Amino acid sequence: MRLPKLRELQASRQMVDTFRGYNHNLRISDGEFFDMKNMTSDYYPVLSPRKKRGVYTSPESPKGMIAKDALCYVDGSNFVINEYPVDMGLNDEPKQLISMGAYVIIMPDKKWINTLDVTEFGDIEASFTSTSDVTFSLCTVDGADYENMTVSADEPEEPENMALWIDTSSKPHTLKQYSATSSMWVQIATTYIKISSPGIGSAFEQYDGVDISGIVSEDLQDLNASMVIWAKGDDYIVVIGLLDNVTEQTVEEGAIKVERKMPELDFITESENRLWGCKYGVANNGEVVNEIYASKLGDFKNWSCYMGLATDSYTASCGTDGQFTGAITHMGYPLFFKENCVHKVYGNYPANFQIQTTACRGVQKGCERSLAIVNEVLYYKARNGICAYDGSLPTEASYALGNEVYSDAVAGSHGNKYYVTMKDVMGQWNLFVYDTAKGMWHKEDDLHAESFCSCRNELYAISNGDIITMLGSGDDYEGDLEWMVQTGEIGISSPDMKYISRLTVRMSMDIGSEVRFYAQYDFSEAWEELFTLRSDNLRSFSLPIRPKRCDHMKIRIEGVGMAKIYSITKTIEQGSELS
């Protein structure tokens, strides 16, 4: 009797020896993984877990970090540099620390410290309220009193050379000086008033821009405004103004107030030796504003100093709607983001400052700390993903993260990598790392970093009250590292009957490490263990693994300790569409 001859199934081998990281999409390539934990691109193309993290220090209340010659951070009320604490009376809010030369500006406290001389620190703002009588008198620009002035509507008769006359024949009154050479009274274009009171000038510096209030004299109401201090002593200040006679305001008439203010800013950055900031909402004076500000050149204390010079402060209103969501300096230009646009400031002094507005994907609200620069490219969290901005238009860099929705992103950069921790819709934190040189994402763990800071050869993060080292320097922070990778659907793209008869994994393991292999078959949700391997010595393995016969499957590899996977080879036996 003759029987039909069985047709031998065609067998093929597919080897993956280049592993390209995380891709959380429905269809992914061989060598990519739908899910992972604690993996890294450091050993690319080899698949390997990351290094263990370390701990730098465990302060009582870390609130912010900045890199100077050494790592500086805020611990409660202290600013700490080189592990030397300076009690600055800081509040307990999260900080934004901005470097400007040797100085560090601490927001929202509006304080500063000189990192070259930590005994030099103070407040950006200053204020004086009089507690005794205040005297107003006409003076020169350096504060010297005028003497023997005539106040009248008619010219003085037979004046001496350089005689002074306040002409009251018209308003506003004018101060004139007699020139014997030309036999003419010449108007003095700019006149100054000395405001004298004990201690009035001690908190301020020459050329500070201040707000003055509380002056009751009708003739001096113009002084209740923003003024520039042209000269000062401990007990007087000199501002622009004119009055006919010496005037005194008694304590009973009320106190005068002199203030050097900094605007209430949503976000702040430094560019070209100026501090830049933005505000959307109610300002100090109660007005609703939508403005961008710049401090005086080289002087972070002055935000309302207008002298007609290239060093002046700067303020400009914006025409776009919505709150500001972040600020950073990129390629020498201050950038101010909203969710749907970016404002870019061009120019190098107030007269030629220009603000260009580009409608594009901006920074998502609540993700202002996601702004970080890697190799001249700015990365940030927009509403629909991570964007890369090179100065023209942003492009998406996070296709591999899939369709998951994330918020509250905090990011840092070190070397070629962009580290970002984000919260998903379930409230779970996830740390992702984007290797910009290799174009690959990797998922680490559920670390919730409050801030990052790259200093020298380490990336620091504040998490759970510790300052940890992401690259592993310092004391031990973690035990044996647990890691995992999970493939996408293997075999689902082919319509023919087939099954994976064998998996061969080439790998090496450190002493004490353990690796477990699991499979999920067809549409089952259960994971079945295939193989467990424990290493008692440092060696490499080639593991033959035989999964069940199925149409498609997923592979999950879990491990504890250091291991490296060099290749995964599939042996596939394949028939036709029917058999």
Question: Where are the language model's segments positioned?
Answer:
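Beta-strand-rich solenoidal segments
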Residues: 85-138, 225-226
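Blade-loop segments of beta-propeller domains
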Residues: 60-62, 67-68, 76, 81-101
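Beta-sheet repeat architectures centered on beta-propellers
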Residues: 1-70, 362-366, 373-377, 384, ...
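Short, surface-exposed terminal/edge motifs of secreted or surface/virion proteins that either
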Residues: 78-81, 110-125, 163-189, 219-221, ...
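Small/polar beta-strand repeat architecture
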Residues: 4-9, 122-126, 130, 171, ...
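Extracellular/surface-exposed low-complexity repeats and stalk/linker segments enriched in Gly/Pro
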Residues: 85-93, 134-164, 183-191, 401-410
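Beta-propeller and closely related beta-pinwheel folds
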Residues: 52, 261-413, 440-443
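Short hydrophobic/aromatic-rich beta-strand motifs
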Residues: 102-106, 156-177, 207-213, 227, ...
